[in-house]
Amino acid sequence: MQQPPSQPQPGMGGPPPPPQGAAGQPPQWGAIPPPMPPHQYGAPPPQQPPAMWGQPPPQAHYGQVPPPQPYYAAPPPQAMPAPAAADEVKTLWIGDLQPWMDESYIYNCFAATGEVQSVKLIRDKQSGQLQGYGFVEFTSRAAADRILQTYNGQMMPNVEMVFRLNWASAGEKRDDTPDYTIFVGDLAADVTDYLLQETFRVHYPSVKGAKVVTDKMTMRSKGYGFVKFGDPTEQARAMTEMNGMLCSSRPMRIGPAANKKTTGVQERVPNAQGAQSENDPNNTTIFVGGLDPNVTEDVLKQVFAPYGEVVHVKIPVGKRCGFVQYVNRPSAEQALAVLQGTLIGGQNVRLSWGRSLSNKQPQHDSNQWGAGAGAGGYYGGYGQGYEAYGGYAQPQDPNMYGYGAYAGYPNYQQQQVAQQQPPQQ
């Protein structure tokens, strides 16, 4: 596949001219400003260019993104502005951030535009650790819209990742259009989100993004991912046309995936057993909830068999749930990711990790098949894309790149869960 030409990245262009009327010594660049009290949120960060601005970033492997046209604005007033109306929202949500990406890095990403007012990244209240998402406020709604259209889906500076941006409010600008998602397996270890996205985008213009699922501990690829489309016709074409085509050094295996829901999700937190089962590398059991009472164990096995060798299937008598155990963990992970929200019989099922059968209770125990884990182990609530778009346990924008907010991008590494809705047809 022909790679796009290498060009500069957004936010890494030449230094902008200093703002007119600036006085005094330039602020020290690179230091994160001290936390501001809530009533000062929105105060502008320094408008001066960084001292090391001219340093070129490392060359990315799969092509770069042309820089946006710079827009410079006079420093905004220091007084707290009046609350913006719905049509004046000028804050963007940014997600799928790595743990080392702090306010300084995010500010530098957009500094060349001259339009950044403030950056706020969300941290865990107890540990203080960054949660992988935050908010960037710009000088105007028009500026925020330009940045959203220019940067979203493009490469971030100095890292093989793409920007995940969306409006921070529930305004009319939010992308609520349906997504049509496919599963992509057998990916080479060097395939990134950007490479997977561009592999499809050159053939299908409606591609909205792609996500390679990674191990949350090692951050290494699990060998599969998802691509989402805005056009169901292109999604259907890609299912056949791209199956067996090369991505990097290996042919891809394409399969169906449940699609983004257009309705909200009810988030729940998994119980301790559910979290333990999810993180157990030896657990190969999947809980299947919301099961049609007419579905038999043989039917359930037929549905799950394409993703690996199934060693056991159980549907407890009188229960609308079941359990599927695989020989190995990767098979279970792929099945959980691909079949989440799938229509089996007359019902859309919800999947989660069941209790490891190696630790199951005696026969008379009602939890022997992992019902305790299934009760709180539903996946979703990307709460990311993400899910996430995977690996961050934080609430995310469910309408932007919500890998976990809809079954096509299940952020099953997270500790957040959701009641699944039927997929878009």
UniProtKB/Swiss-Prot annotation:
Domain of life (superkingdom): Eukaryota
Record keywords, A-Z: Cytoplasm, Nucleus, Repeat, RNA-binding
Sequence ranges of Low complexity compositional bias: 21-31
Main location group: nucleus
Location relative to the cell: Nucleus; Cytoplasm
Gene Ontology CC: one annotated term: nucleus
Single GO MF annotation: mRNA binding
Pfam name, any one: RRM_1
Coiled coil residues, start to end: none
Compositional bias per record (Pro residues), positions renumbered to this chain: 1-20, 32-80
GO biological process: mRNA transport
Region (Disordered): 1-82
Nucleus keyword on record: yes
PANTHER family found in the cross-reference section: RNA-BINDING PROTEIN L, TRNA SELENOCYSTEINE 1-ASSOCIATED PROTEIN 1-RELATED-RELATED
Family named by the database record: Belongs to the polyadenylate-binding RBP45 family.
Subunit organization: Interacts with RBP-P. Interacts with RAB5A.
Protein name: RNA-binding protein L
The organism's taxonomic lineage, starting at the top: Eukaryota, Viridiplantae, Streptophyta, Embryophyta, Tracheophyta
